[in-house]
Amino acid sequence: MSTTPERSGGVDTILLVRLAAASVLLAVSLVLELSELLRTVLLAAAVVAAGYDIALEAVRSVQRKDFFAAPVVVLFVTAAALISGFFAETAAMVVLYQLGSAIVAYSQERLCQSALSNIGKSRTEIYEHISAMIGDREGARTAISSALESAAGAVLRFGIVIAVLFAVLVPLMTGLTYRVSIHRALVMILVCNTGSVVASLSCVTLTGMCSCAGKGIVTERAEALEALADTEVAVFDKSGVFTDSSPEVVAVEPVRLDRDTFITFAAHAAYYSEQSFAQAVADLYGKDYKLELIGDFVDIAGAGVELSIGGAHVVFGKRILFAGREEELPPDSAGTGQVYYMTVAGKYVGRLSVSSGMNPASENLVRDFRDEGVEKLVLLTEEGREESTVFAEEMRFTGLFSQCDTAAKLKCIRDMRSATSGNVVYIYANGVQMHTDADVDIRVSGRSKYADILVLPEYVDELPSALETAKRIKSISAINALITFAVKAVVITLALTGYCNLWLAVLLDSAAAVAAVFNSDKVSAESHARVYKRKK
C-alpha cells in the first residue's frame, strides 16, 4: 500500500515496536486456548497498537475533505470488518498494512538517496535544489502522475459502488450469506485503494531529475522535464549555445583616437545592445557610463549598432553594416575573431575583434536531437542571412531565422507555438529576460532565471539525453501503473470467488507497490538509455 505524506521515509523504530507487540498479541490470541471475550480483547488491542495512527491520519484527511484517502479507506474497512466479526483477520490486515507502508516508505527513501548520489554533494546548489524537491510532492508532480492519480481515484470510487452493490444484491440472488458478501466487498474496497498506484509516481520523476542533474541538466519543475518527451519543434539560439557563451575582446586597433577613448566610445555604443558582442565590450570597459550622452540608438540585429554619442553620429558593427555608406574601411586582418568597425561623424576611428569560437560540446547537438525523433530543428540568430545560412546547412537545421533581435526571436517562438500541435522547446543562453511562449525554456548558463531547465554550458551535449529520460519517465510510470492495476485485478477476481481475504489483499498490494518503486530506478539505468559521450 502507500506510505502517507506524514510518515518519514526512514525506519520508524516506534512503529516496528508497535507492530511487534501487535503481532505477539495476535499470535497469543490464536495459539492459546482463551475465552472468546479475552481473545476479542487481545485482537482489539492488536488492532489499536498497530493502527491507531491510521485513525489519526484519517481524521486529518477528512478535515482536508479528502474522503477517499488511503487512511480513510483503511479505517472504514477496519471498522466494518470488526463489526462483521472478522477480528483475527482484521488484526493481521492492519499489521501487514502498516508493515507494507513502512517497507514502501523505506524503499522510496533508499531509491531517492541512491538517485541523489548521481549528483554528488560537491555540486552543492544542485544537490540542495533536488533534495528540496524530494520533500515537495507538488514539485515532483507531472501530467502523467496527475492522470494516473485521477484514474486510480476513479477506480476506487467505481470499486466502492460495485462492492456495495455486491454486498447487498448477491445474497438476494445466490446462497451467499450477507456476512460472506460483506467480507468479499470489503476486500474489493481495500484493494481498490489508490495507495499502491501512486507510491512510485514521485519516485519515477525524482529519479529522472537526479539522473539529469548528474549530467548538468537541472529542472525547475518536473512538468518541464516531462514535456520534453513530446517535443515536436526544437528552437536553438546560436549565440551561447553553439558559439562561445562568454565572448571576449581579443584585439583593439584604434585609429585617430587613443585606446581608452576608443574603448569608451565602443562601450557606450554597445551599452543598450542585446547582441553577444556587447557584453564583451562592457567587460573590457569596466568604468562608469554617461548614459545622458547616448541618443537615437538603433540595435541592428546581426550587424551592430547606430546611434549618437554627445551629438556625434556613431556607427559600430560588422563590415556588412557599412555597405553602401561613404566611410572607407581597411581590409580585414588575418587575426581571429569577429571584427567590429567604428566610425564617428563619418570618420573611421578603429576596430576591435571579439572571440567567436564554437562551443565544442554542441558539435553534435542537432544530430542527437534528430536521433531522438525531433524532426523540426530551427535556428535563431542575430547574424546576417548569408553567414547564418552556411552554418544552418552545415548543422542540418530544417528552419532558419536570421538577423533576429530579442523581439523577433520571441515572435518566431510565438508563431511556431501557435502553429504546432506538439511541444516547442526553446534553447538559449542569454538575451531573453522572460518566459517565452515555448512549452519549455532551456537556458545554457550558470543561472536559471526565467528558465524551466538549466543546462551548464559544458554539459550542453547531454541535453538530448534529457529527452530520452523524459520518455522513460512516461513509459515507466505507465508500466508501474499497469503492474499495480494488474495485481488489483487479480486480487479482486480472487475476492469475488472467495479465494482472498483482507490480509492477503494487503500483502499482494504492498508487494506490487514495492515492485513499482524499485522498477522506478530503470529511469536512470545506463543499460536502458542511450549514452551521450562528451567530447573532451
Language-model regions, residue ranges each:
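Flexible metal-binding regulatory segments at protein termini and peripheral loops
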Residues: 1-38, 114, 124-140, 528-536
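Conserved cytosolic catalytic loops of P-type ATPases
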Residues: 1-4, 116-132, 158, 222-266, ...
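Hydrophobic alpha-helical transmembrane segments
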Residues: 43-85, 89-119, 126, 140-238, ...
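Conserved ATP-binding TGD loop and adjacent catalytic N/P-domain core of P-type ATPases
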Residues: 117, 124, 129-132, 136-140, ...
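Active-site-proximal glycine-rich helix-loop-beta segment
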Residues: 193-195, 232, 238-239, 244-245, ...
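P-type ATPase nucleotide-binding
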Residues: 249, 253-375, 385, 397-415, ...
